[in-house]
Amino acid sequence: MINDILKDAENRMSKTLEVLADDLAKIRTGRAHPDILAHVTIDYYGSATPITQVANVTVLDARTLGITPWEKGLAGKIEKAIITSDLGLNPTNLGDSLRVPMPALNEERRKELVKLVKSETESGRVSIRNIRRDANGDIKELLKEKEITEDEAKRAEDNIQKITDKMIAQADALAVKKEQDLMVV
């Protein structure tokens, strides 16, 4: 029973970290990275489809992405989707492919993005702590129903705290790495 609670808490915390990593990957740094376009969608045969599912997105150099659609007619739609996204990018249509230069971030925008990183990370930490609270509540419920002893409950809560500390440290490491990427000029 206790092991199930611990495994469930750890799995849920890991999923929270994955979501945080995805959210942080969407925040644009000064460098080109294909994940920047992961949430940009186009209308493809009547459904909203991510660009990454209809084209190859490659890094041409540190500040330029190359997009090669699998169907020639999609270049215009992809260009329009990138322009209308909130990323502030201006792609160049080369006919059968696109080039997306990454403009350098100014100091003010960098600071805004660092604040956004901190906010996203704090949301991740709160989610992890909520999972800890739920797991501790489950442990207390078992103790209340006399299914485990007080020593077992204390040990389980200590283990949950260790898992929580480890996951929060990983979230902080993701944030620090992203902040460093943002501050590179």
Swiss-Prot record:
What phylogenetic lineage does the species belong to? Bacteria, Pseudomonadati, Pseudomonadota, Gammaproteobacteria, Thiotrichales
Say which domain of life the source belongs to: Bacteria
**Which chain regions cross the lipid bilayer?**
none
Family, per entry: Belongs to the RRF family.
Naturally occurring in which organism (per UniProt): Francisella philomiragia subsp. philomiragia (strain ATCC 25017 / CCUG 19701 / FSC 153 / O#319-036)
Primary residence: cytoplasm
Q: Name one GO molecular function term.
A: ribosomal large subunit binding
Sorted alphabetically, the Gene Ontology cellular component annotations on this record are: cytosol
Give the function comment from the record: Responsible for the release of ribosomes from messenger RNA at the termination of protein biosynthesis. May increase the efficiency of translation by recycling ribosomes from one round of translation to another.
Please give the biological process terms from Gene Ontology that the record holds: cytoplasmic translational termination
Give compartment(s). Cytoplasm
Supply the gene name.
Answer: frr
Sorted alphabetically, which keywords does the UniProt record give? Cytoplasm, Protein biosynthesis
User: What name goes with this protein?
Assistant: Ribosome-recycling factor
